[in-house]
Amino acid sequence: AYNVWMSGDTSAEAVHALARQVRGDGIRTLALKVGDHWQISMNLIDPLRIGPDIAFDRIAQLVPFMQADIDHCELVGLLSEAALKKISSERWDKLGLGIETTIEYRRSHGYNF
């Protein structure tokens, strides 16, 4: 999963609307409230084609029209190195990504799946 956390003052209506509008071609979405914050939780069906960067960009393009703000992003699980390398390394921090979030990195550091 790939989650985009919204700022605390983002309304339920805005998050549900964002989730609906981002859902589609390669992205499944849910709007979830966790504690005092909302997140858009996404399953990226084919991350080599539509990765976290594209998912984030879809939300970021809509946020100004929804009176919403993005707080942070998180990858839940791992991403292939090939999918990560399709994204500019300059964006990794903002997207909550890094080489250590790849399957290959974890395998090379003794993790077994």
Regions found by a protein language model. Give the residues of each.
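Long, contiguous binding/interaction regions
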Residues: 1-113
